Amino acid sequence: MNRTNICKNIVQSIKDYITDQVKLEPHRVEKHFVRRRKLSLLQVIIYLFFSSKASMFQNLSQIREELGTLSFPDVSKQALSKARQFINPSLFKELYYLSVDLFYSQISSRKLWQGYHLFAVDGSRIELPNSKSTFDFFGEMSSYPDPNRRYTMGLASIIYDVLDDYILHASIHKFLSSERAAALEHLKVLEDMGLYNNSIIIFDRGYYSEDMFRYCVEHGHLCVMRLKEGINLSKKCNGDMISVLQGTSKEGTSDVPIRVLEIPLDDGTKEYLATNLFDPAVTKDMFQELYFYRWPVELKYKELKSRFAMEEFSGATAVSIQQEFYINMLLSNLASLIKNEADEEIQISAKSTNKFRYQANRAFIIGRIKSIVPKILCGLFELSIIEQLYTDAVRCRSQLLPGRSFPRKKLKSKGRPHFRNKKASF
């Protein structure tokens, strides 16, 4: 099944889910959305899909104008803010998981690198609004030189299907949570879905530990982990070597072979990689290309923070933050389906005489997905609008500029740029 049809199936499944009272029952707070009130559970759910980064006044006005079939009532922003607190974030997590399950069960063929599927794991700090709720849930921190200044942040972590441009699993935690613990959660999901066979998982610096590497070996995960330059494995490595992680009878562990590679970079520095991939078809020179496939997960965070403005939360509670986090993961996956399908058509129709290669404009697709999904959910649009979006995406293309490379600049830390009292006007 092609990606456009999978996108249609996901949206239809979401619509079926949120209109089924039996399925919604576990996701509402007890004794709420029971009586007939102005705001129904369905109306609040669709509002959360519909709302933009503008103020709530703008969103409430626009949803009544644009989604007439929803019969959205004239309520205050305080009433809506209160109502959303009675929807468990597990609902939106479930809808996001639905998008993952349908994609991997319905996709006809997946992309490969040297016969392997590629996944990348990475975490990123998320700026959160300051409130009692976020302080209690995510933790409260102070800063130097003013210890009285209190703030909070979160840690987002994802495992990303690099070649198929899909977020397989995502989670949000306290800022000081362990990235390795979050990564282990991702690996267990990969095991539960049966997707770890014939797959390579790429980790950045900071993820390697002997326990982490042993877990990958013992559970059948092929992995590539970048090492810090200061550890013994890196210091002893010269080219391509096989070492052994010694087991101990006290801990009940056995010896584990580990391949360590020294990779020269274009700027003259070296990076060190640890792997349990001993396939002779994957040579040392290919590992530099393989590790570079981790870069798209960085671009995915850029998409989430820039295109989706993920850190511009409309609510200031832990419940609101988790709701919006999983909605963004879901919409990002829907946009990637259209983007990749359109890219394939663009490549097929490209002429050999073209000066540049082109790709579908992701920003355009994200904007349209954000606009049409709530309209499909409330019955204003038919699913066929997704096919029209695909057609438009093939036409709305951007140049691919090859060979671009920029030196990494060490930026000075900036203050918090996201403020709830400074919302966009539209």
For the regions a language model picked out, list residue spans one by one.
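A short, well-structured juxtamembrane/interface segment
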Residues: 100-108
